[in-house]
From Swiss-Prot:
Protein name per UniProt: Probable cholinesterase
Enzyme Commission number, as recorded: 3.1.1.8
Active site (UniProt): 217, 337, 451
Lineage: Viruses, Varidnaviria, Bamfordvirae, Nucleocytoviricota, Megaviricetes
UniProt similarity note: Belongs to the type-B carboxylesterase/lipase family.
Listed GO MF terms: cholinesterase activity
The protein's role, per its UniProt record: May be involved in the disruption of the host membrane.
PANTHER family the UniProt entry points to: CARBOXYLESTERASE
C-alpha cells in the first residue's frame, strides 16, 4: 500500500484489530467507533447505536425528547444495534436478539469512504414504517440501502422513534403540561433525530444542507407530516430540503386517540398520571396488544399538528404562501396496497375462493379497520357497496374487492396530495406507480405487488421473508429507480445530470401538473427500466361500472361531508396552478 493511501486511512480513523476493521469519527459528544464493511467491493463505514436523545423513561415518558448532551473522551462503541422501542411481541415469537427497551432513541449511519480528500456526500434519512404501532430502522434491514450508499455516494441515516402508546398516547390524564407534545412524541423523536443529523453529519463527510427524508407506510405519512408542520417555519428548524414518500400521505388524523387511550387506561387500571408513569413498559405493551392502527399521531392538541395535515398541506402549498416547502416532493404507491391488511387481519378471505367474503356491512367494518380514521358509518352507504361481494360477484377471491378499496384509499389520497404539492411554485412534485412483483413466500401470486415492495427495488436487495428474490430484469428496474432517487437526493431534480448516471438509459419523468402524469415503474423484458409516464387516470383499471377517478370523487365528497371540510376540486387546482 502506498504511503499516501496509508495516511488517508489514518486520517479517516480506519484501523484493524484481529481481522475486524474499525473506523472512528468525532461527533459533538465525542469520538465514536464503527466498523468498515464492504458492499459490491466498495468500503462503507457503519455506525450503529449512536445516542441522540436521553432515554425517555420515568418522568420523560410521554414527553418531548430531550437532546443527549453528555460528553465522553474515549471512543464510544457504536458497532451494534440498540434495542427496539417498546411494542407488542406475539406470544411464541422468537425474542429480539438485541431486546426491547424504553431506552431506545439511537441513530445509525452508513457512510461511504471518501475517495479523495474533501469528498462530501448528500444525506438520505430513512424513516421506517409499522402503522405507528411497531417497527425499527433495521426491521427492513436499512443496511440494505448500503448498495445505494456506495454506488451513488450517499450517506444513509436511520433513527428510532417511539411507537404505539409510547409514541402517541394522548389521554387527558397526562395533564396540560403535555400540550406541546401530547400525542406526537414519536414525531418529535423523528424531528430530534433530524436535528442530530443537521448538527453532526459533517463529521461523516455529509452535507448538512443537503438532506432528504424518505419513508414508507407510516414512514411515508411521517415525512409528509414533517413537511407540513408549522415547526418548519421557526428559526433553526429547516432540517431537510427534499422529501420522498412511499405508500403514505397527509390526510385526516384523530383529534385524540380517545378509544385507544380509554381502553388502555381501563386495562391498566390507572386513574392518575403518576400511576401511568410508574408502570413497567411491559404492562403497557401487553395491554395494548397487537391492535392495528390503535395509536396514531393526534391533531389540535399539540404544536406539531395544530390542524389537520391535509389543511396544513393546502395552506403551505398555496402559491402565495411564504412558508417552508421542500425543493422536491416525490410520492408514490404500489399496485396492491391492500394485500398487507388483508393478510394480517382477514386471513379467512385471503387465499380461499370458498369463503363468503365481504358483504356490504362487513366491507364497511373492514374498511374502517384498514383506514383507522373513518368509521363503518362513513363507508356504508356510498363506498362499501362498490367493493363488497354483492357488487364484485365476478371476482375469484372474495378479498379482491377489499384489496381494491385499500388500493383506492392509497391512490386517491396520493392524488389529492400531489394536486396540492404541484401548486407550490417552489416545489417540484413527482408521483409514481409501482407495478413489479418480486418473489415472496408470504403472498400468493394473485396479490401481485404488495405494500413495501417498491422499497426492495430501491435497495436492490430482498430481506428473505417478504421479498425472496429479484430477477435480473427487476434489478435493472431497481438500478433505474436508483438513478432517479440519486438525482432527487443530490440535485432536487429528476433530470439526472451527474457523471455517475446515464441520462440516455432512463425516460423523462415530468413534474405533476394539469395532465396528472406519473411514472409507471414496471420491469418489462431484459435491460428495460420503467415504462413511459402514464396518466394518473389510467393507472388502475375499471372495476365494474365505476371508473377509478369517479371512485376518488365519491371518496372525496363523502369525506368532506363526514368531516365538514371543503371538498377538493381537482380541476380548479390543476387548471389554475399547473406547471
Amino acid at each position: 500500500m502506498t504511503d499516501h493511501k496509508i495516511i488517508m486511512l489514518l486520517l479517516l480513523g480506519i484501523y484493524c484489530i484481529q481481522a475486524t476493521q474499525f473506523t472512528q469519527v468525532n461527533i459533538d459528544n465525542g469520538p465514536i467507533k464503527g466498523t468498515l464493511q464492504y458492499v459490491e467491493g466498495r468500503a462503507i463505514r457503519v455506525f450503529k447505536g449512536i445516542p441522540f436523545a436521553e432515554p425517555p423513561v420515568n418522568n420523560l415518558r410521554w414527553k418531548a425528547p430531550v437532546p443527549y448532551t453528555k460528553k465522553w473522551h474515549n471512543p464510544l462503541n457504536t458497532t451494534e444495534y440498540k434495542p427496539k422501542c417498546p411494542q407488542y411481541v406475539a406470544p411464541g415469537t422468537v425474542p429480539e436478539p438485541r431486546g426491547i427497551s424504553e431506552d431506545c432513541l439511537y441513530t445509525n449511519v452508513w457512510a461511504p469512504v471518501p475517495e479523495y480528500h474533501g469528498e462530501t456526500f448528500p444525506v438520505m434519512v430513512w424513516i421506517h414504517g409499522g402503522a405507528f404501532i411497531s417497527g425499527s430502522p433495521e426491521d427492513f434491514g436499512v443496511g440494505n440501502f448500503s448498495i445505494l450508499a456506495v454506488t451513488k455516494r450517499i450517506i444513509i441515516v436511520a433513527a428510532s422513534y417511539r411507537v404505539n402508546a409510547f409514541g402517541f398516547f394522548s389521554s387527558e390524564l397526562l395533564g396540560k403540561s403535555q400540550l406541546e407534545a401530547r400525542g406526537v412524541y414519536g414525531l418529535l423523536d423523528q424531528r430530534l433525530g433530524l436535528k442530530w443529523v443537521k448538527n453532526n453529519i459533517a463529521a461523516f463527510g455529509g452535507k448538512s444542507k443537503d438532506i432528504t427524508i424518505y419513508g414508507q407506510s407510516a414512514g411515508g405519512i411521517s415525512v409528509c407530516l414533517q413537511a407540513v408542520t408549522p415547526l418548519n417555519d421557526l428559526p433553526g428548524e429547516k432540517l431537510f430540503t427534499r422529501v420522498i414518500g412511499s405508500s403514505g400521505y397527509c390526510d385526516i388524523l384523530p383529534m385524540t386517540n380517545n378509544s385507544a387511550d380509554a381502553g388502555l387506561v381501563q386495562k391498566l387500571n390507572c386513574t392518575t398520571k403518576e400511576c401511568l408513569y410508574a408502570l413497567p413498559w411491559q404492562n403497557i405493551t401487553n395491554a395494548v396488544g397487537p391492535g392495528f392502527l390503535s395509536f396514531q399521531p393526534t391533531v389540535g392538541i399539540n404544536k406539531f399538528l395544530p390542524d389537520q395535515p391535509i389543511s396544513l398541506l393546502a395552506d403551505r402549498t398555496n402559491p402565495r404562501s411564504k412558508n417552508f416547502v421542500p425543493d422536491i416532493y416525490m410520492q408514490g404507491f404500489t399496485a396492491n396496497e391492500g394485500t398487507f391488511v388483508l393478510y394480517n387481519y382477514f386471513p379467512q378471505t385471503y387465499d380461499n375462493p370458498n369463503t363468503p367474503g365481504f358483504p356490504t356491512q362487513q366491507m364497511a367494518d373492514a374498511l374502517s379497520i384498514a383506514s383507522g380514521n373513518y368509521s363503518a358509518e362513513f363507508y356504508y352507504n356510498d363506498l362499501a357497496p362498490l367493493y363488497s361481494t354483492e357488487y364484485n360477484s365476478n371476482v375469484t377471491y372474495p378479498g379482491q374487492g377489499f384489496i381494491s378499496r385499500v388500493d383506492d384509499i392509497m391512490a386517491c389520497n396520493t392524488r389529492r396530495n400531489m394536486i396540492y404539492w404541484q401548486q407550490s411554485k417552489k416545489t417540484k412534485a413527482h408521483s409514481w406507480y409501482f407495478d413489479s412483483a418480486p418473489d415472496t413466500h408470504i403472498y400468493p401470486s394473485w396479490t401481485k405487488v404488495f405494500h413495501e415492495s417498491d422499497v426492495f427495488y430501491v435497495a436492490r436487495r430482498c430481506d428473505g421473508l417478504w421479498c425472496t428474490n429479484l430477477t435480473c430484469q427487476q434489478d435493472n428496474l431497481g438500478k433505474t429507480m436508483n438513478i432517479y432517487w440519486n438525482s432527487a437526493i443530490r440535485a432536487a431534480s429528476l433530470t439526472p445530470k451527474n457523471k455517475m448516471d446515464n441520462l440516455r438509459d432512463v425516460p423523462v419523468w415530468p413534474q405533476y401538473g394539469k395532465n396528472e402524469v406519473v411514472m409507471h415503474f414496471t420491469a418489462v423484458g431484459e435491460n428495460k427500466g420503467p415504462q413511459t409516464s402514464v396518466l394518473f387516470s389510467s393507472i388502475i383499471s375499471a372495476d365494474g361500472d365505476y371508473q377509478y377517478l369517479q371512485r376518488c370523487k365519491i371518496l372525496d365528497r363523502v369525506r368532506a361531508e363526514y368531516y365538514n371540510i371543503p371538498a377538493l376540486d381537482p380541476e380548479t387546482y390543476l387548471n389554475a396552478c399547473s406547471k
